[in-house]
Structures are given as C-alpha cells and as structure tokens.
Curated annotation (Swiss-Prot):
Enzyme Commission number(s) from the entry: 2.7.7.38
GO cellular component, one term: cytosol
Function (record text): Activates KDO (a required 8-carbon sugar) for incorporation into bacterial lipopolysaccharide in Gram-negative bacteria.
Principal EC category: transferase
Species: Stenotrophomonas maltophilia (strain K279a)
Assigned keywords, A-Z: Cytoplasm, Lipopolysaccharide biosynthesis, Nucleotidyltransferase, Transferase
Transmembrane segments: none
UniProt xrefs under HAMAP family: KdsB
Primary subcellular site in the record, as a coarse category: cytoplasm
Biological pathway: Nucleotide-sugar biosynthesis; CMP-3-deoxy-D-manno-octulosonate biosynthesis; CMP-3-deoxy-D-manno-octulosonate from 3-deoxy-D-manno-octulosonate and CTP: step 1/1; Bacterial outer membrane biogenesis; lipopolysaccharide biosynthesis
Protein name: 3-deoxy-manno-octulosonate cytidylyltransferase
Length: 257
C-alpha cells in the first residue's frame, strides 16, 4: 500500500456554517469523525491544521492525531496545510492527502485511492471524482464538475455543467441525456509536500477567482492533475445546516445496519 500522511484543514470561522468543525454529528464534533476516517484509511500520520484552540481541545481524546496550530490569516486551506507541512517537518517527497474537514463519511478506500493516483500518475497533484447521478446535481452551482483527458488528467473544473450537451439540454434540463457520463468532483487532494509548498506560493489565477475554485490555480500554472474515480460512494461534504441534518440522518441509517 502507498505510504501517505493525511492533513485536515479545520478553520473555525466557516462562512456558511460558523464553527463547523465543532458542530455535533451523532453527539461528537464533526472534526473528530473526519480524523477517525483518516486513521481508518491507514495514514502514517494524521494532522489537523487549525486556527482555534477549541478545535485542538476537541481532538485531545485521539492520541494518534496531531494538531498544528496555524495562523488565522490564511486565505485558503492550501495555505494552512503548507504551514502544517512545515510544522510537521515532512520531506519534500512525502505523499500528503488533503482531506477536507467537512467529510465525515469519506471512505477509507477513497482516501487511499487519491494517494495511489498521485504515485501512479505523472502529475504533481491528484484528486477524485464520481459519477453525476441526476440533472439537479449537474446544474447545481454548489456541485463542482470536471472533465478529464485520455490520460485521466483534469482538463477543467467548473460550477457549470460540463460538458454542455447541446442537443440534449435543448430538449430538456430535467433529465440527463443518454450517451454521456458526467463527473462530480470530490474535494480531496494528493500531492508531495514539496509541491504543496509550490502550490501555496503560486499567485491566485484568473479562472480560480472567477469560479472560486482553488484547484484551477494549478491548471492555469500549467501543471496536470490526475483524476481517479472513487472506488466507493463518497457522500458530499457538509457546508450548510441542511447538509448537517442530512448527515445526521445518514449516520443514523448507517448505525442501524
């Protein structure tokens, strides 16, 4: 199995769900669920990069998880993880998986898959995708879509429905046209620790600013991103109170099995 470490950015002041890492899911803080998922995936180290002591305190019961207290001024999770990597002292060739702090149902196989995609590909960065199941998801601007080339590398990420099915969508936008498969991006990333520092040092790109998608900075700078298909279902992360309610229902369903 590919050796890797997991870093989880956990900022307290989330705009759409303030205090998100500490919101309770099944009676426990959200960040605790995410950290356990990383441990279950077999990561050599699991770090949570945060800017708030309350989040660090919530993790005190997980001895295997380390906490990096990072600056409150970081503009993005990538910047926060770059500081975490420096604190951890990872060598430049260390495989780092960036697991978002709002992914309490991230499957262990998916976490391992993004690390494997990095090692097996020729790109300095990797990520995951899964199939879009319905038209509502495809047209939702909060759901990021992507297209990839024959080398399984990302060509573009967008909040818009890509590729645009000219004839099919002219007929209806209520159902997905037959004969084409769309991909939903899963916001988990893999990179070597050295490239993570490069990424954080790059200036924001024009497309990144238009779409508000940080990964576009890498494509605009001319670097490829390997895209693997998640080997297991990868439920969407938690961004809103409604998402948290759905997550609570899913947790209860899983517990009843």
């Amino acid at each position: 199995m590919t050796e890797f470490v997991v870093a989880i950015p956990a900022r307290y002041a989330a705009s759409r769900l303030p205090g998100k890492p500490l919101r309770l899911l099944g009676g426990e803080p959200l960040v605790l669920h995410v950290a356990r998922r990383a441990l279950q995936a077999g990561a050599g180290e699991v770090w949570v990069a945060t800017d708030d002591q309350r989040i660090a305190d919530a993790l005190s019961g997980l001895a295997e998880v380390k906490v990096a207290m990072t600056a409150t001024s970081h503009a993005s999770g990538t910047d926060r993880l770059a500081e975490c990597a420096r604190i951890a002292g990872w060598a430049d060739d260390t495989v780092v998986v960036n697991l978002q702090g709002d992914e309490p149902f991230a499957p262990a196989a998916g976490i391992r898959a993004v690390a494997q995609a990095l090692v097996e590909g020729n790109a300095p960065m990797s990520t995951l995708a899964t199939a879009v199941e319905d038209a509502e998801t495809l047209f939702d601007p909060n759901v990021v879509k992507l297209v990839r080339n024959v080398r399984n590398e990302a060509m573009y990420f967008s909040r818009a429905p890509i590729a645009w099915h000219r004839d099919g969508f002219a007929r209806s936008r209520e159902v997905l046209p037959e004969g084409h498969a769309w991909l939903r991006h899963i916001g988990i990333y893999g990179y070597r620790a050295g490239f993570l520092q490069q990424f954080a040092a790059m200036p924001p790109g024009r497309l990144e600013q238009v779409e508000s998608l940080e990964q576009l900075r890498v494509l605009e700078a001319g670097y490829p991103i390997s895209v693997a298909i998640s080997p297991e279902p990868f439920p969407a992360g938690i961004d809103t109170p409604e998402d948290l309610e759905r997550a609570e229902a899913l947790l209860q369903t899983l517990a009843a099995r």
